[in-house]
Design a protein with these regions (language model features):
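Bacterial Sec-dependent N-terminal signal peptides
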Residues: 1-23
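Extracellular beta-sheet/turn segments enriched in Thr/Pro/Gly and aliphatic residues
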Residues: 106-142
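Short proline/glycine- and polar residue-rich coil/turn motifs
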Residues: 63-68, 130
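A short tyrosine-centered beta-strand micro-motif
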Residues: 82-86
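A short, amphipathic beta-strand motif
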Residues: 24-32
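Acidic, glycine-anchored loop motifs typical of Ca2+
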Residues: 90-97
Length: 142
């Protein structure tokens, strides 16, 4: 009985460590923040269909703007493709304000530092493949 219990505990511990080893961290630094007020919202996406859609984030982090650079880390992410979209919520109203034509009036940026011309970039163009701990920089200086 002791052997069976020891074996079960060993298997459980092994699976626990394997599960932890297959997750990674993504650190995202936003640089070039000119207006030091409001919040930076980091949206992490895993699904191309939900990319840039309200409620489509896999995870989200909001931090108060205190400096020209802000950094957050998304922890325990499974291996796969991700894309990041950030916006600077200067008036702290929990939404990306837009003008009459639907164009954001608050600063925003995407992973891979893609700059949209007439529409948001695709998930594929912004995607990052995560198979190890990674750090990326997104420039908000436009």
């Amino acid at each position: 009985m002791k052997t069976l219990l020891s074996t079960c505990i060993s298997i459980f511990i092994s699976f626990h460590f394997l599960a932890q080893a297959s997750t990674y961290n993504l650190t995202v630094k936003v640089s070039g923040i000119e207006v030091k007020k409001g919040m930076v919202e980091y949206g992490l996406f895993r699904d191309a269909e939900k990319f840039t859609k309200i409620g489509g984030t896999y995870r989200m982090i909001r931090v108060k703007v205190d400096a020209s650079e802000e950094t957050v880390t998304f922890h325990n992410l499974p291996k796969g493709k991700y894309a990041v979209c950030i916006y600077l919520d200067e008036n702290n109203n929990d939404q990306c304000d837009k003008n009459f034509f639907g164009i954001p009036t608050e600063r925003f940026a995407f992973s891979n530092n893609l700059r949209p011309l007439l529409s948001a970039p695709s998930f594929e163009a912004c995607s990052i493949y995560l198979n190890e701990n990674k750090s990326i920089i997104i420039r908000a200086d436009y």
